[in-house]
C-alpha cells in the first residue's frame, strides 16, 4: 500500500516533532516541511534530509544560506495528501483557502478555533469520528492531557462534573521573548479559562470548568484535577483505569517535580527529551466523599505529537480502529 504523503507547514516546536513522528511510521512519509526564513531550525531540517519549502519571495534567501528550497509552499501543498499546519496560533486559519484550493486534507493545532476545522480530535476519545474527514483540529496540549484522563474515567465510573486548575508553563524553553520571569499571572482573569470549554468540543457531555495561571517555568504544565463521579469507586480503581492507558505514565519512585520528570525523559533517551504521556502522580489519586483528586504534569512541547499522527491515519482511513492506531503510533515512535 502506498504511503500517505504528509507535509508539515511550520517547522517549529510542534512541527519538527510531528515531522519526525510521521516519518517513523510505515504508512506515511514526509514529503516536505516549510520555513519562512533560513534559520537554525531550517538548517537542522536540511541536515536531516527533509525537503524545505518556503514563501516564493524568500527562495533566494534559502539558496544564499546554503539550504536551497525544493520549491514554494504552494508547490508543497499540491504534492501532499495531508497538510499538518503547525504555524503559530491564529495564523493557520489564513491557510485554509490554500488547502481548499489544492484539494488536500489539513490538520490544525489547538491554537486555532474549533470552528475552523469543525472537528476537534483526541485519539482516545473520538478517533472514529475523524475517519475520512478533510479538516481536523488536534486540541491543545492541556486539552489533550485532560481528555486522555477524563474520557476513560468517565467511561468507567460516570462523571457529574469536572473542575481543573492549571499551572501553565510561561513559555517554551527556546522562547526568549515571553514570560513571566518573576511573577504568577492569572490567565485569564475572567473565568473559566478556555480549557474546560475546549474539552467539551471533544467530549460534549462533560460538565467542566477550568481556571489557569502562568508560572515562571518552561518545563511542563501541572493540572490539579477534581472530578465528582456518578458511581462509587476507590482510588485503587482509578489507578487501574489510568494505568491501563498507554499514554498515561505514573511517576513515583521519588519523583516530586516536573524537573525530575524531564530528567527521566533524558535518561530513557527520548528524542528532544520528549514526554509524550500524561505524567500522573499515583500517590496523589485520592477519593473523598465521592470526589476524585489527582495531579498530572503535561509536557507541552510533545504531548500532541502522537495525536497528530493518529489524526492523519484516521483522515486517510489507513486504520479504522482508534486503539490499533494508537498502538501502531506508539510502537513506531518508541512510546
UniProtKB/Swiss-Prot annotation:
Question: Can you state which reaction this protein catalyses?
Answer: D-glyceraldehyde 3-phosphate + phosphate + NADP(+) = (2R)-3-phospho-glyceroyl phosphate + NADPH + H(+); D-glyceraldehyde 3-phosphate + phosphate + NAD(+) = (2R)-3-phospho-glyceroyl phosphate + NADH + H(+)
This entry's Enzyme Commission designation comes to: 1.2.1.59
Localisation per UniProt entry: Cytoplasm
Q: Does the keyword NADP apply?
A: yes
Keyword Nuclease among record annotations: no
Cite the binding residues for NAD(+).
13-14, 111, 169, 300
Q: Which Pfam families match?
A: DapB_N, Gp_dh_C
Which InterPro entries does this UniProt record tie to the protein?
A: DapB_N (IPR000846), GlycerAld/Erythrose_P_DH (IPR020831), GlycerAld_3-P_DH_AS (IPR020830), GlycerAld_3-P_DH_cat (IPR020829), GlycerAld_3-P_DH_NAD(P)-bd (IPR020828), Glyceraldehyde-3-P_DH_2_arc (IPR006436), NAD(P)-bd_dom_sf (IPR036291)
Q: Which UniProt keywords apply?
A: Cytoplasm, Glycolysis, NAD, NADP, Oxidoreductase
Residue positions binding D-glyceraldehyde 3-phosphate: 140-142, 171, 195-196
| GO MF annotations, alphabetized | 4-hydroxy-tetrahydrodipicolinate reductase; glyceraldehyde-3-phosphate dehydrogenase (NAD+) (phosphorylating) activity; glyceraldehyde-3-phosphate dehydrogenase (NADP+) (phosphorylating) activity; NAD binding; NADP binding
Provide the Gene Ontology terms for cellular component: cytoplasm
Q: Which NCBIfam families match?
A: GAPDH-II_archae, PRK04207.1
- Sequence similarity: Belongs to the glyceraldehyde-3-phosphate dehydrogenase family.
The entry's protein name is Glyceraldehyde-3-phosphate dehydrogenase 2
Q: Which organism is it from?
A: Methanosarcina acetivorans (strain ATCC 35395 / DSM 2834 / JCM 12185 / C2A)
Gene coding for it = gapB
Amino acid at each position: 500500500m502506498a504511503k500517505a504523503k504528509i507535509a508539515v507547514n511550520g517547522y517549529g516546536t510542534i512541527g519538527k516533532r510531528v515531522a519526525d513522528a510521521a516519518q517513523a511510521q510505515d504508512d506515511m512519509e514526509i514529503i516536505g516541511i516549510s520555513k519562512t526564513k533560513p534559520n537554525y531550525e531550517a538548517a537542522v531540517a536540511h541536515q536531516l534530509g527533509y525537503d524545505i519549502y518556503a514563501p516564493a519571495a524568500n527562495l533566494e534567501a534559502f539558496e544564499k544560506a546554503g539550504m536551497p528550497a525544493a520549491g514554494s509552499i504552494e508547490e508543497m501543498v499540491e504534492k501532499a495528501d495531508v497538510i499538518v499546519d503547525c504555524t503559530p496560533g491564529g495564523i493557520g486559519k489564513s491557510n485554509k483557502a490554500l488547502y481548499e484550493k489544492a484539494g488536500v486534507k489539513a490538520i490544525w493545532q489547538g491554537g486555532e478555533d474549533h470552528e475552523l476545522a469543525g472537528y476537534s480530535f483526541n485519539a482516545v476519545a473520538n478517533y472514529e469520528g475523524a475517519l475520512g474527514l478533510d479538516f481536523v483540529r488536534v486540541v491543545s496540549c492541556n486539552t489533550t492531557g485532560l481528555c486522555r484522563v477524563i474520557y476513560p474515567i468517565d467511561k468507567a465510573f460516570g462523571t457529574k462534573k469536572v473542575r481543573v486548575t492549571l499551572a501553565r508553563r510561561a513559555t517554551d524553553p527556546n522562547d526568549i521573548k515571553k514570560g513571566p520571569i518573576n511573577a504568577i499571572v492569572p490567565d485569564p482573569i475572567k473565568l473559566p479559562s478556555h480549557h474546560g470549554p475546549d474539552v467539551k468540543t471533544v467530549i460534549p457531555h462533560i460538565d467542566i470548568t477550568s481556571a489557569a495561571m502562568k508560572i515562571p517555568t518552561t518545563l511542563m504544565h501541572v493540572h490539579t484535577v477534581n472530578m465528582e463521579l456518578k458511581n462509587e469507586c476507590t482510588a485503587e480503581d482509578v489507578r487501574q483505569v489510568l494505568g491501563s492507558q498507554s499514554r498515561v505514565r505514573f511517576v513515583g519512585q521519588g519523583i516530586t517535580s516536573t524537573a525530575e520528570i524531564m530528567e527521566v525523559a533524558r535518561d530513557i533517551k527520548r528524542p528532544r527529551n520528549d514526554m509524550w504521556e500524561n505524567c500522573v502522580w499515583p500517590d496523589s489519586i485520592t477519593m473523598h466523599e465521592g470526589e476524585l483528586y489527582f495531579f498530572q504534569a503535561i509536557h507541552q512541547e510533545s504531548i500532541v505529537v502522537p495525536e497528530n499522527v493518529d489524526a492523519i491515519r484516521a483522515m486517510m482511513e489507513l486504520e479504522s480502529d482508534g486503539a490499533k492506531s494508537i498502538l501502531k503510533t506508539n510502537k513506531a515512535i518508541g512510546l
